[in-house]
Structures are given as structure tokens and as C-alpha cells.
């Protein structure tokens, strides 16, 4: 089963023919965890907030996971805390991450978690061996017989149907909530990778800080995230109509509720430090890249992840580093889909399979 250099619909068809329905691909993210399960000629997809509610006195005692736990963020009684098991793409709490993964696998298997043979989990490209083993151990504790961790960038390339087996090269820019990966792929393997431990979460926090500074109003992180989604943009030469959105917070002067208007320029200002770091990382990758690979990635670079939806981003990248990029049509799920494809074909990443894929 050759999965490399095929379009997404062709890959899905091969998964269907093999009947590999007891496998899951998981994008274990800082903000959201996405599960992809082959179903017929497509994928069943499940998006789960990466939030766990636990007892304050015993953080290993899990009370809720996912949407229910997310609703508790900032609203819990004194004896309960709602937390994110991952920070900057790295597991902060083994027990809480295990609860999240069990919940995700349960969703993906329609409550038949014991039937899962294999899961493949996408994680940041610069994860240490200790971090990789932690994810593998958690997956096995959660009930999977076989667990493989792969770079989110490589997984995204596979999920997007990029021709990763070709020698010319492709590049994926994966902009997550906690971290961002820039991955260069040739002959089915990673030739270079640069990870920055910044992402959409940092933009949200910067929005909160800027609203405090400008309006003397404290808004919650959810309001900041909504503003980013509604009017998000980055500074670029692109012609973008300025827009505004309302947010409700607490006046720092009166402690009363107060509505403020957040405009797209404020979001662009909040995003600027993260965009600058991304551009610097891209410049480093291009500096290390051979002329042969540069000619390949020039027309085969895709941007995925939630932050890719900021207007003006593709124009800004081209202005700064001279590489035209395409924003994925399905930026939030390609990592999970790619992981599901690898789960359906465990040998897909072995060198001899990569070489065979070229013939």
C-alpha cells in the first residue's frame, strides 16, 4: 500500500480497500486534540478541547475532559481546577494527558476503545526522546496495542496529500496553539526541521495584554481567542478591509462589566512578535537549504494549523522570505488525517517503502 505522492482522495480509497477501521490518527494539541478514523472512503473526525478538570487537592483525580472541562476554565469552584495537560506542545502532566488521550480514543472508537490496534500521534518536531516515550507510554496505557509518534509537520504533509516521496522536496509550516514547526521533506523523510515554542496561545495572551493597556479592561482568554478568529490578521502589504468585533470584560477602574471593540490592527499588533519569530525561523531553514531543495519547495509549501487563518499571512511570508505558500483548505485536521494514514500503513515510514514509492 503506497501512500506517498498520492492525492488525499486516493489515499482514503486505499484505506477503505484495506478495511483498516481499528486504527486512529491523533493530533495531540495544546489547544485542541483532533482524532481521525478511517470510515469508508473518508475520515470520521473528532475535535476535542485539550482541557481536563481535576480536584485541586489531587490533580490526578479527573472530573471532566474536553468540552465539559473547557466550560469550567476560569469558572471553577475553589476545590476544582481546569487545566491543559500540554504546554507549548509538551506534556505537563502524565496523568492528565493520559485522561485526555483515553477520552480521545474513546471518541474515535465509538466507546469501543478495546478494539483499537494502532494509533499514530503527531507531536512537535523537536520533541525529545523522553517526550516521545511519554506519549508512547500514555497511548499504551490508554489501551492501544501499537503506538507511533511522528512529527506533526510530516503528518500534515501526508494528510494534505503532498508528494513527499519526490526528491525535489516539499515544506510544511505547521502553526499550532503552543508551538510551530517548519519541516522540509524529501524522499519521504525529514531533511530539516525548525520548531519555535510559540503559537496561537501567545497571540491570545498578547491580545489580553493590549486590551488591558489600551482600554483598562481585562478580558478572558476565550474572548481574546474569539477576537483573533473573528478579525485576525497580520501586518502585510495585502489589502485587507479593517474589521472590528465586540468583547466583554471587566473594567479595571470600576470592576463592572464593560464592552470593548477589538479591531484587526490590535490583533495584528498582538500577533507581530510571533510572526517575527516565524519569519526568523523560516530564514534559518532557507539558509541551511540546498539550491536543489529550494527550487522544489518554492512551489510546494503549505501552511497548516489554526494560526494559518490569519489574513495576510501568506503575503507577509512571501514579502519577508520570497517563498510563495498556500494555506491548507483543511488546516485543523490534516495532522490527524496524516497520522491516521500512517496508522493504516505502519510500514509507510520505513526507508525501503519510501524508495519503493518513487518507482
Feature locations, PLM:
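Nucleotide/phosphate-binding catalytic cleft detector across ATP-hydrolyzing
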Residues: 1-172, 185-301, 308-335, 340-359
Amino acid at each position: 500500500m503506497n501512500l506517498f505522492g498520492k492525492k488525499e482522495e486516493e489515499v482514503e480509497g486505499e484505506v477503505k480497500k484495506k478495511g483498516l477501521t481499528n486504527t486512529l490518527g491523533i493530533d495531540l494539541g495544546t489547544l485542541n486534540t483532533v482524532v481521525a478514523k478511517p470510515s469508508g472512503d473518508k475520515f470520521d473526525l473528532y475535535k476535542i478541547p485539550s482541557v481536563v478538570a481535576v480536584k485541586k487537592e489531587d490533580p490526578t483525580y479527573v472530573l471532566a475532559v474536553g468540552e465539559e472541562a473547557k466550560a469550567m476554565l476560569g469558572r471553577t469552584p475553589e476545590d476544582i481546577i481546569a487545566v491543559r495537560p500540554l504546554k507549548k506542545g509538551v506534556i505537563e502532566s502524565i496523568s492528565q494527558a493520559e485522561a485526555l488521550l483515553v477520552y480521545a480514543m474513546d471518541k474515535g472508537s465509538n466507546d469501543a476503545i478495546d478494539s483499537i490496534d494502532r494509533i499514530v500521534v503527531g507531536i512537535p518536531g523537536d520533541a525529545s526522546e523522553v517526550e516521545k516515550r511519554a506519549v508512547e507510554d500514555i497511548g499504551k496505557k490508554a489501551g492501544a496495542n501499537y503506538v507511533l509518534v511522528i512529527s506533526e509537520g510530516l503528518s500534515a504533509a501526508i494528510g494534505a496529500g503532498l508528494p513527499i516521496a519526490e526528491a525535489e522536496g516539499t515544506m510544511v509550516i505547521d502553526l499550532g496553539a503552543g508551538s510551530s514547526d517548519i519541516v522540509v521533506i524529501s524522499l519521504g523523510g525529514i531533511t530539516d526541521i525548525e520548531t519555535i515554542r510559540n503559537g496561537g496561545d501567545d497571540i491570545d495572551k498578547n491580545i489580553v495584554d493590549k486590551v488591558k493597556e489600551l482600554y483598562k479592561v481585562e478580558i478572558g482568554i476565550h474572548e481574546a481567542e474569539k477576537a483573533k478568529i473573528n478579525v485576525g490578521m497580520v501586518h502585510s502589504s495585502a489589502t485587507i478591509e479593517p474589521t472590528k468585533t465586540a468583547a466583554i470584560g471587566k473594567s479595571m477602574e470600576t470592576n463592572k462589566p464593560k464592552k470593548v471593540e477589538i479591531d484587526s490592527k490590535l490583533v495584528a499588533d498582538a500577533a507581530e512578535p510571533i510572526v517575527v519569530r516565524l519569519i526568523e525561523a523560516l530564514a534559518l531553514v532557507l539558509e541551511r537549504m540546498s539550491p536543489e531543495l529550494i527550487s522544489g519547495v518554492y512551489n510546494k509549501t503549505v501552511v497548516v494549523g489554526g494560526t494559518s487563518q490569519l489574513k495576510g499571512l501568506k503575503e507577509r511570508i512571501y514579502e519577508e522570505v520570497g517563498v510563495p505558500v498556500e494555506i491548507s483548505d483543511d488546516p485543523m485536521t490534516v495532522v490527524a488525517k496524516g497520522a491516521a494514514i500512517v496508522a493504516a500503513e505502519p510500514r509507510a515510514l520505513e526507508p525501503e517503502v519510501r524508495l519503493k514509492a518513487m518507482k
